[in-house]
UniProtKB/Swiss-Prot annotation:
Gene Ontology BP terms: argininosuccinate metabolic process; L-arginine biosynthetic process; urea cycle
Species of provenance: Paraburkholderia phymatum (strain DSM 17167 / CIP 108236 / LMG 21445 / STM815)
Annotated residues for binding of ATP: A17, F18, S19, G20, G21, L22, D23, T24, S25, A43, G129, T131, D136, D194
Secretion signal, residue range per the UniProt entry: none
Compartments where located: Cytoplasm
Protein name listed in UniProt: Argininosuccinate synthase
Swiss-Prot/TrEMBL keywords: Amino-acid biosynthesis, Arginine biosynthesis, ATP-binding, Cytoplasm, Ligase, Nucleotide-binding
């Protein structure tokens, strides 16, 4: 039997992830009028553009919800965000500027916690506002079924009857007005925004055109650093980690990780740190474009990676980064709690993050322009005296280096022989301007 319901299950409990926006408000009221028994579940993810969470369940009840609950997901969201940071679970970047997978992390938390709450209420049918072309429909599907194997999925936006009756925002707004609700449709923006405490995503509409840039976006977690009239003073900030956990900013500790990240957001946001413009591949392999904000995570990650490079050896760092890219893709695909993701994540947390203790001081300027001013850690393996150009006691002598270089003759000879073979069979034919050695067919 299919887990996807294409028509409204009348007379049954239907849970809906309720944001309080026009789409979910109209869908909830429509479901009630059509004979379903809707239950509304709202995730408090610390969205920077939401200032009245307590009113959302009340509105859901007014629109016809049989029950409405507000689920505080902030602690879990920050915990998963720090886990992603510790394991470098970020696979999308452009010219070294990173997208911190803030929406996929939010979906992992929302999908599991809301369905768990529904299960407590005996609600085994779930709907949300994700569209069939996006990533979220698959993410929510996977996380929901992981928590509740008996779950059925009903999405009004996949129901042709709903689409025919309320297919657009104008129709939804008129439907709510005719139902007696003073619902005023908000002004249409040039793009769509989704956010949580970790970061914000701006996409769709005008941003679908690559001719439209970051300058049309109004940041909600930071400042428009590209504007000449925005004054941004440079600022020094010190980040302290203990065993992979961020614990202090500028010497100040916090009662919990949520409060620390909020302060990191404020500091990074003052500079527009962590904003990026990315072209990415959705789960269905179609390319999309997003402009992202993540000021707090960007600040913490800059300090964390500095300590990683000062503490761990080259092979460990290489493994951390390769595994992080793979883990980031799993996270993006809605597989954050799959066994292969847990293995990669916990390996990094144990063998990389646990050694990360120390302080990094940065100077923040505009956007992603910053400098590292100081790095301190009791675990540093960076020892400048080993390679000092001054006359100091050395761990190896010039004669030692002569011997080491002499041993390289073996692989240099092997490389030269291979290049000669490639040249003979026509695989190697560099032009005159090439720096590649002109290996001839005959030995010299």
């Amino acid at each position: 039997m299919s887990t996807i319901l294409e028509s409204l299950p009348t007379g049954q409990k239907v849970g809906i992830a309720f944001s309080g926006g026009l789409d979910t408000s109209a869908a909830l009221h429509w479901m009630r009028l059509k004979g379903a028994v809707p239950y509304a579940y709202t995730a408090n993810l610390g969205q920077p553009d939401e200032d009245d969470y307590d009113s959302i369940p009340r509105r859901a009840t007014e629109y016809g919800a049989e029950g409405a609950r507000l689920i505080d997901c902030r602690a879990q969201l920050v915990a998963e965000g720090i886990a992603a940071l510790q394991s470098g679970a970020f696979h999308i970047s452009t010219a070294g500027v990173t997208y911190f997978n803030t929406t996929p992390i939010g979906r992992a938390v929302t999908g599991t916690m809301l369905v768990a709450a529904m299960k407590e209420d005996g609600v085994n049918i779930w709907g949300d506002g994700s569209t069939y072309k996006g990533n979220d429909i698959e993410r929510f599907y996977r996380y929901g079924l992981l928590v509740n194997p008996d779950l059925k999925i009903y999405k009004p936006w996949l129901d042709q009857t709903f689409i025919d009756e309320l297919g657009g925002r104008a129709e939804m707004s008129e439907f709510m007005r005719q139902s007696g609700f003073a619902y005023k449709m908000s002004a249409e923006k040039a793009y769509s925004t989704d956010s949580n405490l970790l970061g914000a995503t701006h996409e769709a509409k005008d941003l679908e055109s690559l001719e439209s840039g970051i300058k049309i976006v109004n940041p909600i977690m930071g400042v428009a650093f590209w504007r000449d009239d925005v004054q941004i003073a440079k600022e020094e900030v010190t980040v302290r980690f203990e065993e992979g956990q961020p614990v202090a900013l500028n010497g100040k500790t916090f009662p919990n990780a949520v409060e620390l990240l909020l302060e990191a957001n404020r500091i990074g946001g003052r500079h527009g740190l962590g904003m990026s413009d990315q072209i990415e591949n959705r789960i269905i392999e179609a390319k999309s474009r997003g402009i992202y904000e993540a000021p707090g995570l960007a600040l913490l990650f800059a300090a964390y990676e500095r300590l990683v490079t000062g503490i761990h050896n080259e092979d460990t760092i290489e493994q951390y980064r390769e595994s992080g890219r793979r883990l980031g893709r799993l996270l993006y695909q809605g597989r954050w709690f799959d066994p292969q993701a847990i293995m990669l994540r916990e390996t990094a947390q144990r063998w990389v993050a646990r050694a990360i203790t120390g302080e990094v001081t940065l100077e923040l300027r505009r956007g992603n322009d910053y400098s590292i001013l100081s790095t301190k850690s009791p675990n540093l393996t960076y020892q400048p005296e080993r390679l000092s150009m001054e006359k100091v006691a050395s761990t190896f002598s010039p004669r030692d280096r002569i011997g080491q270089l002499t041993m390289r003759n073996l692989d240099i000879t092997d490389t030269r022989d291979k290049l000669r073979v490639y040249s003979q069979v026509g695989l190697l034919a560099p032009g005159e301007a090439s720096a590649l050695p002109q290996i001839k067919g005959d030995k010299e």
